């Protein structure tokens, strides 16, 4: 029984017009609302639209009203019931005699013994119906899908508006609204069922649940946009029909005969038989159900659209089977463990849980066969690369089902321990499981709740498939159960992984080998994938490079180039030994020839052309030819770069030499976080009683807005800086840098002169507290003495010369009048020192001892001075003025705070910088003290800072 189905996604439903009147109550065109999740929509398959009611097919059975006025296309004659031109039950390509006979018998019992003639066996046919709407010439149906022999109102749809259901009856004169969380039922396990009034005039001929809230009857109709998920049943609610052939004889008011009025006798007579019929019918109907039947569309496209939303929902920890928690369920998500029957989302009619003895034996069988046949139907597409199954259906379909397996011929884990594609299941296998399910009632009921696993299908790129047999996975289906949908195949083996991280972790196993890339056609192995790719051309006979002279073909371009030299006579490789005029067409020949000239180097390497003067040098060279030579085992501890040879690492470390003797290794910490803390400390420490803070200079203001960390300065044993850093030696000329620095410093001096007046006023405001005179215009010679006077206010800091100048940098825009030790006010005069003062301090001879690696102190995380090696890259780390005006191409360099021993109880909130550290930078330009740049040129005291 082939079920033509299609996964509808939002854009399709959003522009799917339906202009047919619904029970003569609507004459307008309806556009369904946008839906971002897939819906398995039942739509008609027909050769052409039928104008007006279809002509009934001759029927051998008594007239039985059907569930909707639908036209049908009957390629093969079959006993089908019609009443007044209305549609018939949908039976698709299968002999349905037994099920139809049982359905007719059930109908006879339900209506009180009315006669019903069993349907005779018939050849396979294809009859499908319109989804809940009469078809006319103006109807536009874009896709086709399966119309099961069940009322269309039980097709699953995602509920809307927090699980609120709006159920519209067939005559559109009443809308019954329910809430899945607030209903009361005598049978808590009864699945949600559509309400039905006792009156026969209130039968649900074509009913649906609107996605929107309850609306007036004139605005409610059933369409593709309706959320058709059965609402909770009231105490007097009843269950819809399980088969459209089981209806009473009332032609005008067809009411399903299996409606439950909670009468035990009636339940036993009607619903028990109906449930058994539905089980057999649904199991047969699931025989050949495809995943997608959209014309001209890749079956995987509908899944890609909603994959991220589904995965995000499952990661929240809410069970997907709880309608109160999630309010929705998908037909591929396994069994339902409570408050919901499997048939609600499996496109089969629901059966009340109050009669589980007749209905619970088949849910898992229906779902398993449905999913198995979905894969079987598209098996050809799988082989062609259109769609690739990734064992998403094998988790719940095989494990813990009490004998209810998929019946796949390939089996689980078949083919080299990998996960095989589930396919080749026959109709007989599905029938077997349907019968087996009837014999394993209790086991299936227990397994239904125990095996309610959450399985979500995932799209797979066909290019990532392992081979013609399907997907091979190192861990079976579990390795491919998650991820974003992409599949990553190992280049060294056939294994496929769902995430790039898993692939990288797996690759490390191969990288332990000297040559992990092994040829599958021969025993050769290679160190990298490119070599293997070139080698594979030999086995495949691929020779893309052809000589235009002799038409000879080659697998590699280098081979062709060498071959062309035989025609041209070109010998580009010439011997450089004095007096030797030989030349060669190939480099290897030149290398071999060069040995004859190395008479002073008797130690020759047998693997290459190199010769050495002594044996230790040769022994050191030989390991370079070992098989693991491609492994980068030598790693730089400063920048993390790795090299294959120790000599390469040594050369690389020389680049760090001029910096490693001045700074410690990389320390953890976020520059942005530390800068933010410093800015917060600067803003939060301002005392309103001290008056408004002085306006910052433009450069510092821009620096604060950019959120850059403050400048760090630390001691060094050298009294000079390199004029051009090793990393930027080729970027700028030393003279140009000096000239640009000179211009920048002149701009800085002008800014400082404007700032001095405001700083002096601020200093007068604070210094009466401590008796310290203002220091804005003091000669440079007195600056050090005044700083030593301030040092007496910090007796807890040892050694004595240490004094914090952090307020100059960490808090450039606000006076620090509320420091914890009470000495923040006296530092305000130095908030912006004039340029001559800063120059003098920078020119003071250093008293700090030589750099000692053992004296490196750990930088605290609360320091306002961020190690510059943790800042952003150079040219961007100090962009406190526009990049066009920033000519400094140096790398920012940071040094350790060597002798800072402060008491946390009485110290500033941030780490302090001692006077020794400031003195140590005798040749730093003035721009550094203002935070403009770190590196400059070496100048002596008293010289201009050019």
Swiss-Prot record:
GO terms for cellular component: nucleus
Region (Disordered): 10-30, 156-269, 683-853
Stretches with biased composition (Polar residues): 161-176, 198-230, 242-269, 813-822
Ranges of Low complexity composition bias in the record: 177-188, 739-762, 770-790
Single GO molecular function: DNA-binding transcription factor activity, RNA polymerase II-specific
A Gene Ontology BP annotation from the UniProt entry: negative regulation of transcription by RNA polymerase II
Tissues showing expression: Isoform rn and isoform roe are expressed in non-overlapping domains in the larval imaginal disks. Isoform rn is first expressed during the early third larval instar in the leg, wing, haltere and antennal part of the eye-antennal imaginal disk. It is observed as a ring in the leg and antenna disks and in the presumptive wing pouch and capitellum of wing and haltere disks respectively. In wing disk it is expressed in 3 concentric domains in the wing pouch. In late third instar, expression of isoform rn in the leg disk is no longer evident, but is maintained in the other disks.
InterPro entries assigned: Znf_C2H2_sf, Znf_C2H2_type
Name of a matching Pfam family: zf-C2H2
Keywords for the protein's UniProt record, in alphabetical order: Metal-binding, Nucleus, Repeat, Transcription, Transcription regulation, Zinc, Zinc-finger
Localization (cell): Nucleus
Zinc finger (C2H2-type): 488-510, 517-539, 545-567, 573-597, 603-625, 634-656
Presence of the UniProt keyword Thylakoid in the record: no
Composition-biased stretches (Basic and acidic residues): 828-841
PROSITE patterns: ZINC_FINGER_C2H2_1 (PS00028), ZINC_FINGER_C2H2_2 (PS50157)
Quaternary structure annotation from Swiss-Prot or TrEMBL: Interacts with nab; which acts as a corepressor.
PANTHER family: TRANSCRIPTIONAL REPRESSOR PROTEIN YY, ZINC FINGER PROTEIN 143
This protein's name: Zinc finger protein rotund
Native source organism of the sequence: Drosophila melanogaster
Organism taxonomic ancestry: Eukaryota, Metazoa, Ecdysozoa, Arthropoda, Hexapoda
């Amino acid at each position: 029984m082939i079920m033509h189905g299609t996964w509808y996604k939002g854009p399709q439903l959003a522009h799917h017009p339906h202009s047919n009147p619904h029970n003569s109550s609507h004459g307008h065109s309806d556009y369904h609302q946008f839906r971002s999740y897939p819906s398995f929509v039942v739509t008609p398959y027909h050769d052409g639209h039928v104008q007006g009611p279809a002509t009934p097919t001759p029927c051998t059975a008594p007239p039985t009203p059907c569930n909707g006025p639908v036209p049908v296309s009957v390629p093969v004659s079959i006993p089908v019931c019609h009443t007044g031109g209305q549609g018939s039950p949908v039976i698709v390509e299968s002999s349905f005699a037994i099920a139809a006979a049982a359905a007719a018998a059930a109908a006879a019992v339900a209506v009180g013994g009315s006669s019903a003639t069993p349907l005779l066996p018939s050849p396979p046919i294809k009859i499908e119906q319109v989804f809940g709407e009469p078809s006319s010439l103006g109807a536009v149906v874009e896709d086709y899908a399966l119309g099961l022999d069940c009322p269309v109102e039980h097709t699953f749809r995602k509920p809307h508006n927090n699980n609120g259901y709006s159920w519209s009856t067939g005559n559109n004169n009443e809308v019954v609204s329910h809430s899945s969380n607030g209903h009361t039922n005598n049978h808590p396990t009864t699945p949600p069922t559509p309400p039905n009034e006792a009156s026969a005039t209130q039968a649900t001929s074509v009913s649906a649940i609107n996605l929107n809230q309850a609306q007036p009857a004139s605005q409610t109709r059933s369409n593709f946009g309706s959320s058709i998920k059965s609402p909770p049943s009231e105490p007097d609610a009843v269950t819809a029909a399980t088969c459209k052939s089981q209806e009473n004889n009332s032609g005008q008011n067809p009411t399903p005969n299996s409606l439950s009025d909670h009468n035990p006798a009636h339940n036993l007579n009607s619903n028990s038989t109906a449930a058994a019929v539905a089980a057999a019918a649904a199991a047969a109907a699931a025989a050949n159900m495809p995943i997608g039947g959209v014309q001209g569309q890749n079956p995987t496209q509908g899944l890609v659209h909603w994959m991220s939303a589904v995965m995000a929902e499952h990661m929240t920890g809410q069970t997907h089977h709880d309608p109160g928690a999630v309010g929705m369920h998908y037909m591929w998500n396994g069994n339902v463990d409570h408050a919901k029957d499997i048939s609600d989302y499996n496109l089969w009619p629901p059966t009340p849980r109050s009669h589980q003895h007749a209905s619970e034996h088949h849910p898992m069988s229906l779902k398993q066969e449905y999913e198995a046949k979905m894969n079987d139907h598209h098996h050809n597409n799988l082989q062609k690369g259109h769609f690739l199954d990734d064992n998403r259906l094998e988790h719940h379909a095989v494990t813990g089902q009490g004998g209810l397996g998929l019946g796949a011929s390939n089996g689980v884990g078949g083919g080299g321990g990998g996960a095989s594609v589930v396919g080749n299941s026959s109709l007989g296998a599905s029938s077997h499981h349907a019968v087996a399910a009837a014999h394993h009632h209790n086991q299936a009921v227990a397994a239904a709740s125990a095996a309610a696993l959450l399985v979500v299908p995932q799209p797979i790129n066909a290019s990532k498939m392992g081979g013609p047999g399907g997907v091979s996975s190192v861990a079976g289906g579990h390795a491919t159960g998650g991820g974003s949908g992409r599949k990553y195949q190992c280049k060294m083996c056939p294994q496929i992984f769902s995430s790039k991280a898993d692939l990288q972790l797996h690759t490390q196993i191969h990288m332990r080998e000297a040559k992990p890339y092994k040829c599958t056609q021969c025993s050769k192995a290679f160190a990298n994938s490119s070599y293997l790719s070139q080698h594979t051309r030999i086995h495949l006979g691929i020779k893309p490079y052809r000589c235009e002279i002799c038409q000879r073909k080659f697998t590699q371009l280098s081979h062709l180039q060498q071959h062309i030299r035989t025609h041209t006579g070109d010998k580009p490789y010439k011997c450089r030994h004095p007096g030797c005029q030989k030349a060669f067409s190939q480099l290897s020949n030149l290398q071999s020839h060069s040995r004859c000239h190395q008479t002073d180097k008797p130690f020759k390497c047998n693997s290459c052309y190199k010769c050495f003067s002594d044996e230790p040098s040769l022994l050191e060279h030989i390991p370079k030819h070992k098989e693991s030579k491609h492994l980068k085992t030598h790693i730089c501890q400063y920048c993390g770069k790795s090299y294959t040879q120790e000599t390469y690492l040594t050369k690389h470390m020389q680049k760090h030499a001029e910096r490693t003797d001045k700074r410690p290794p990389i320390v953890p910490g976020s520059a942005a976080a530390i800068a933010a803390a410093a800015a917060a400390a600067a803003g939060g420490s301002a005392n309103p009683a001290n008056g408004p803070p002085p306006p910052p200079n433009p450069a510092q203001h821009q620096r604060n807005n950019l959120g850059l960390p403050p400048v760090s300065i630390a001691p060094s044993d050298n009294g000079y800086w390199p004029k051009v850093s090793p990393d930027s030696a080729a970027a700028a000329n030393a003279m140009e840098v000096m000239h640009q620095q000179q211009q920048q410093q002149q701009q800085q001096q002008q800014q400082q002169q404007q700032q001095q007046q405001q700083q002096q006023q601020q200093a007068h405001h604070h210094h009466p507290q401590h008796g310290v005179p203002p220091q804005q215009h003091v000669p440079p010679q007195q600056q050090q003495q005044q700083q030593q006077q301030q040092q007496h206010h910090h007796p807890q800091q040892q050694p004595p010369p240490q004094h914090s100048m952090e307020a100059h940098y960490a808090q450039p825009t606000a006076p620090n009048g509320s420091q914890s030790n009470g000495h923040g006010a006296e530092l305000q005069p130095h908030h912006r020192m004039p340029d001559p003062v800063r120059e003098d301090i920078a020119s003071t001879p250093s008293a700090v001892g030589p750099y000692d690696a053992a004296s490196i102190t750990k930088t605290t995380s609360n320091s306002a001075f961020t190690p510059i090696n943790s800042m952003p890259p150079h040219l961007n780390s100090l962009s406190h003025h526009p990049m066009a005006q920033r000519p400094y191409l140096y790398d920012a360099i940071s040094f350790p705070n060597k002798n800072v021993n402060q008491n946390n109880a009485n110290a500033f909130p941030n780490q302090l910088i001692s006077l020794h550290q400031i003195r140590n930078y005798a040749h730093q330009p003035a721009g550094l003290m203002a935070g403009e740049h770190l590196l400059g040129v070496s100048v002596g005291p008293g010289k201009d800072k050019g």
